[in-house]
Amino acid sequence: MAQISKYKRVVLKLSGEALAGEKGFGINPVIIKSVAEQVAEVAKMDCEIAVIVGGGNIWRGKTGSDLGMDRGTADYMGMLATVMNALALQDSLEQLDCDTRVLTSIEMKQVAEPYIRRRAIRHLEKKRVVIFAAGIGNPYFSTDTTAALRAAEVEADVILMGKNNVDGVYSADPKVNKDAVKYEHLTHIQMLQEGLQVMDSTASSFCMDNNIPLTVFSIMEEGNIKRAVMGEKIGTLITK
């Protein structure tokens, strides 16, 4: 019998760095396998799951821009990096017999389906794992903003933000400030006013305007994705 989750449909946001593990660069097969196993476990429950992956383990558009590259070109390179991560995750999921589709905002029909909202929803209804890649298809927008937009479009109940270096939202960097306090609950407006670096302000404002809750948690602890889907109190919950 399938376990009952708190949410019917979720968007899982993974940073590219989370897929690199301690190496900090590239794709760590052990991490990908662990994430895939956790996602596959959730997919077997009564919960529909979409995944959005960043590309910072391969390329960061802002870094290229800071070094003098054209910002648009640098951002498009970052979008391609997210596709590489998405294909790696898809392969790992399919090795676990988990039906998966990659949908990209930039057409590349040889490797993935183009993003169409109704098609994405249909895949989710058929209990397929959907991986969104290539951001929103436009430069100057982060994958955090992609997560917020796609969550609204597919009417997800929550965005689960899996982090690799922190287990929630703190008042300051806990690695630098030993007096940093971990928040169990925040509002979107608090997050914006206090400048807490959970996601960029565009994404945060979008979540606030569209009443999309977030759960920020550590992806590095085995089983945390399932715990988040079950509604267990892990990490930090951010609501309107």
Curated annotation (Swiss-Prot):
> Which reaction(s) does its UniProt entry say it catalyses?
UMP + ATP = UDP + ADP
Pfam families assigned? AA_kinase (PF00696)
Residues binding UMP, per UniProt? 55, 75, 136-143
Q: Which SUPFAM superfamilies match?
A: Carbamate kinase-like
Annotated metabolic or biological route of this protein: Pyrimidine metabolism; CTP biosynthesis via de novo pathway; UDP from UMP (UMPK route): step 1/1
The record ties this protein, via PANTHER family, to: URIDYLATE KINASE, URIDYLATE KINASE PUMPKIN, CHLOROPLASTIC
The family note in this entry says: Belongs to the UMP kinase family.
According to UniProt, the name of this protein is Uridylate kinase
Q: Which organism is it from?
A: Staphylococcus aureus (strain NCTC 8325 / PS 47)
Highest classification ranks of the organism: Bacteria, Bacillati, Bacillota, Bacilli, Bacillales
